[in-house]
Each structure stands twice: as C-alpha cells, then as structure tokens.
Amino acid sequence: ACKRAGAELRVLPVDQNGEWILDKLDSLIDSKLKIVSVAHISNVLGIKNPVQEIIERAHRFGARVLLDGAQGVVHGKVDVKDLNCDFYAFSGHKLYGPTGTGVLYGKREVLEEMEPWMGGGDMVDSVTLAKTTFAPLPLKFEAGTPNFIGVAALGEAINFVNRVDIDFMTAHEERLTS
C-alpha cells in the first residue's frame, strides 16, 4: 500500500523483550511524516505500549496518530481525549460483539478536514454538475447501507462490557500474568 501511494514505511524497532526502543523514535519522525499507526497494547506480548509519548512526539511534527485499540478496549478503560490520539480503532468481536463490526473514533476537527473515500447513501447532501456537497459528520463517511443488526448487537456488547467492573478484571488479569 505504501508503494502504491508513494509513501515510505518507517518501523520503530523493538528490543529483546518486545518493547519499543524509544531512543530511535526521533530519527523516524520529521516534517514529512503524515501518520503514525501503533498498537495501544500488543496482541502478541500483552505489552502496554507508551503511546502517549509517541503521540506527543508525532504531534510536534504535525503527524496524525492512529491507535489500534483492539486489545486496549478489553484490557482497561480507554479515554481517547486523555490519550489525545487522532484516531482509535477496534473490532467488535474483541468486545464480544459480532464479527464484521467495529469502531473508528476520530477527532471532529480531523474528520471534518478529510474527504470521503467512498460515495453513496445518506452521505451526500447535494449534487450538481459543478460539485458535490457532503452531509455533516458522521453521515459524511456513511456510504451505503449500514449493518444495522451488527451495530445494534455491538452496542449491546459494549453495554455488557461497561457493566463489568473493568478495574477488577484488570487487577485479576495482572494477578494471573505476574
């Protein structure tokens, strides 16, 4: 995908324990950097990555940050505003919801700058021969027919997870893995 887009993929190395070598980060970040994509928590090693440091450094150079939250949302409370990430994504099945569902959080100001990459459905506000005007957020990115059943089921899965004492679960998990 990078090759097709003319982009350069930069990878932050890890040490023998699977932890990022943050000393190498500054050599990877510059004014050309557009987006940083990192896992909030590693699905392989379970390491809680120091994402806030990555986010702060990337933002200093004007880069956007996408956090893969597939493991983060089931292993503790997530506050995207506190993290200050631009995007946070996770799949529904990680929260005991149906496959084929997921969530993409995006900062309003970032989403408003973006153009839709698909067309159709309620995302179009008006069309003339001269231009197309898109609906306001979130409809601007809702092309086609939504997965109504999947979204309703995902909502119930999220409600279930919110009823569980996540602090107890996290403490129990830490006892099991230490």
What are these regions (language model features)?
Residues 1-178:
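Pyridoxal 5′-phosphate
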